[in-house]
A protein has these predicted regions:
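Sec-dependent N-terminal signal peptides
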Residues: 1-7
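Short, well-ordered, aromatic-rich surface patches in folded extracellular/luminal domains
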Residues: 15-43, 95-246
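Extracytoplasmic low-complexity, Pro/Thr/Ser/Ala/Gly-rich segments
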Residues: 20-78
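Charged, amphipathic alpha-helical segments
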Residues: 78-103
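C-terminal motif of bacterial Sec signal peptides marking the signal peptidase cleavage site
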Residues: 10-13
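Generic marker of residues within folded, mature protein domains
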Residues: 4, 48, 104-106
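Residue-level marker of positions within ordered structural domains that often coincide
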Residues: 63, 87, 119
Length: 246
């Protein structure tokens, strides 16, 4: 009887240990953004506004994705250094920075977005309107943060590999007055439905991804992606790969 109790206790202890390990692994969760550089707004088309990805985004596992088209893997040390530097540059900055008095007025240009995940686990983002045009009127830390992320983007463009994903964001923009001969709507790709004002967007996966990539190859000019739906409506069809956390 004493031996049986001991065996039961050991079994329960082992089961408890296994449960604790599973819980720990579940809490780790997927990789998260830890640093980013992107843009918002500006004088761009509705399609570009929806499809525009971060210029460069760094994930907790060291993966760098640039323009949702190129990727590069950093070492743990490089990832940690990048996050630490971005945190130094952005800590204490307001959510929306303003240039010093005397800065020239600049309109219709994108707002630069810089971000880093702090030690508290929260994403700190700073927006700087027209940073490229009036950098001298902003704190130098913002330009340094952008320079750091720009360096990652340059590395990925030169030595990275193509980024692909199993999920795609597609956008159909109404083109009733477009010139040129439209192609039939690609089989397997969802047709726009409901309100289109002025665009219709949908995230797709599976066979639809292969179908849209075949119909509109990556990098193809929008002027060559004119399609007619089964109802006769004309649309310009565009897409990009979704990022891991989208």
């Amino acid at each position: 009887m004493t031996l049986l109790v001991a065996l039961l206790s050991l079994t329960a202890a082992c089961g408890g240990a296994e449960s604790d390990m599973s819980a720990t692994q579940a809490d780790d969760g997927p990789t998260k953004r830890v640093a980013l550089w992107g843009a918002e707004g500006g004088f761009v088309t509705a399609t570009m506004n929806v499809l525009r990805p971060p210029r460069a985004v760094l994930y907790s596992d060291g993966l760098v994705i640039v323009d949702a088209s190129k990727q590069l893997k950093l070492t743990d040390a490089e990832t940690g250094e990048t996050v630490a530097s971005m945190e130094t540059y952005l800590t204490g900055q307001p959510p929306t920075a303003e240039p010093k008095p005397g800065a020239p007025m600049v309109t219709d240009v994108p707002t630069t977005v810089l971000g880093v995940r702090g030690k508290d686990g929260k994403m700190l983002e700073v927006r700087a309107p027209a940073l490229d045009q009036v950098a001298d009127f902003y704190p130098k830390e913002l330009s340094e943060a952008k320079k750091l992320m720009d360096g990652l983007a340059t590395r990925a463009a030169a030595a990275g590999t193509d980024y692909v994903a199993t999920r795609v964001r597609m956008v159909a923009e109404g083109a009733a007055s477009a010139e040129g001969k439209p192609a039939p709507w690609p089989a397997g790709v969802p047709e726009p439905s409901g309100m289109v004002d002025p665009i219709w967007q949908k995230d797709i996966e599976g066979a639809a991804v292969s179908a849209i990539i075949k119909a509109v190859p990556a990098g193809q000019e929008h002027g060559r992606s004119l399609f007619k739906t089964s109802s006769g409506a004309l649309f310009v069809l565009s897409w990009r790969y979704l990022l891991p956390d989208e």
